[in-house]
Amino acid sequence: MVDTNKLTSVAKDVLLAPVYLYQGRKIKRDTVRLPEPHGERHGVIDLPQANNEISTQEAKTFNLMVVGDSAAAGVGSQTQQEALVGKLIPILEQNEAIQANFARLNWSLQATTGHTSFDILRRLYVLPAPEQPIDVMLLSVGVNDTTSNVSVHKWQQQIEDIINIAQRKFGVRELVFLSLPPMAQMPAIPAPLNNFVGAKASVLDEILQQVCAAHDGVNYMATDFARMIS
């Protein structure tokens, strides 16, 4: 049986393709590219010792790596302290489980504006293997795959490849993917392009959830983007 709703949607996108192309080019030409915030992109922090019985020999380091695109890089913030990584570190510092088992927090930020899943995968291949396994890798990806209209198959394969290299090369114990933002609501994207982009982002986000659910040690985090940048 033919899905008439799907056919109607495809036909609409075909008819509006010239409008999408014009609006996309105009956005690329007119949109101001915001700089990435200033600040350190790696560091080691001594944690308050909730468990004073931990000896120097037993003291371990909690290793955090934040990877991805402009959301991870902190675009829109003035400094890294105001950005995602700057807000995440104090939360981890005050976590009782981390305090009880670790003496230090070693963190690094590996993120660049405009990076797609392919760019992130390539970056992970180029980066040297860490001396110690990464306890948590937080990953933001998908916005630029959406705007570049990556195929569904390519997106799924590259997410699978990212998971594979993160676990194999970096020894990641917990990999957390942030959800894609609601791109249809972005004021910089005019109608009808916003609906097309929003629908594409929703498809990629659904696939991301499915891939995460199929792997041990991989989680999908629905993100409140308005709150994250406030």
Annotate each predicted stretch with a short phrase:
Residues 146, 184-188, 228-230:
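Short acidic/His/Gly/Ser-rich catalytic and metal-binding motifs that mark active-site loops
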Residues 1-64:
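N-terminal secretory targeting modules
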Residues 170-174:
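A short helix->loop->beta-strand "cap" motif at the edges of active sites that frequently abuts
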Residues 159-164, 205:
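Generic structural signal for well-ordered alpha-helices
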Residues 109-111, 179, 222-224:
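Residue-level recognition of beta-strand->loop/alpha-helix junctions
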Residues 63-65, 71-157:
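Conserved SGNH/GDSL esterase-like catalytic core that processes O-acyl groups on lipids
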Residues 185-222:
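Substrate-gating cap/lid alpha-helix
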Residues 140, 178-179:
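Alpha/beta-hydrolase-fold catalytic nucleophile elbow
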